[in-house]
From Swiss-Prot:
SUPFAM superfamilies: Homeodomain-like. It is found in: Nucleus. Residues 21-44 have a biased composition (Polar residues). GO terms for molecular function: DNA-binding transcription factor activity, RNA polymerase II-specific; RNA polymerase II cis-regulatory region sequence-specific DNA binding. This is Homeobox protein Hox-A9. It comes from Ambystoma mexicanum. One of its GO terms (biological process) is proximal/distal pattern formation. Residues 1-75 are annotated as: Disordered. Belongs to the Abd-B homeobox family. InterPro entries: Abd-B_homeobox_TF, HD, HD_metazoa, Homeobox_CS, Homeodomain-like_sf. GO terms for cellular component: nucleus. Sequence-specific transcription factor which is part of a developmental regulatory system that provides cells with specific positional identities on the anterior-posterior axis.
């Protein structure tokens, strides 16, 4: 269980791990982000398990319970692939940053909705941008 961590809502039609890019043909409404408690209960603990026979067959090495290091070496990565921001998203984030280096929660939600990003992506972009500005200011020679 993860305490104090809210699941990040995804825009409709996207799966976890997909890149979200700006799509001007689809504007999101608040109802797009909602889900009923029944949906949450049915999805909890429902991880599809791959059949053991598909892993044993083919060119993949068999899982050896006596050798956990070998299993770790052949484990699949669960990391999401890197999704670069579109030029439009970057431009809008930079404009927002020039206006205000820190976002309120409401403004972060609004920016995320407008750019078809998650609130977490916007938050982390602003954190990274502040660190970049700090580094630029530190490296600049003092006169």
């Amino acid at each position: 269980r993860h305490y104090g961590i809210k699941p990040e809502p995804l825009p409709p039609g996207t799966r976890r791990g997909d890149c979200t890019t700006f799509d001007s043909s689809h504007t999101l409404s608040l109802s797009d982000y909602g889900s009923s408690p029944a949906d949450k209960q049915s999805s909890e603990g429902a991880f599809p398990e791959a059949p053991a026979e598909t892993e044993a067959s083919g060119d993949k090495p068999a899982i050896d319970p006596n050798n956990p290091a070998a299993n770790w070496l052949h484990a699949r990565s669960t990391r999401k692939k890197r999704c670069p921001y579109t030029k439009h998203q970057t431009l809008e984030l930079e404009k927002e940053f020039l206006f205000n280096m820190y976002l309120t929660r409401d403004r972060r939600y609004e920016v995320a909705r407008l750019l078809n990003l998650t609130e977490r992506q916007v938050k982390i972009w602003f954190q990274n941008r502040r660190m970049k500005m700090k580094k630029i200011n530190k490296d600049r020679p003092k006169e």
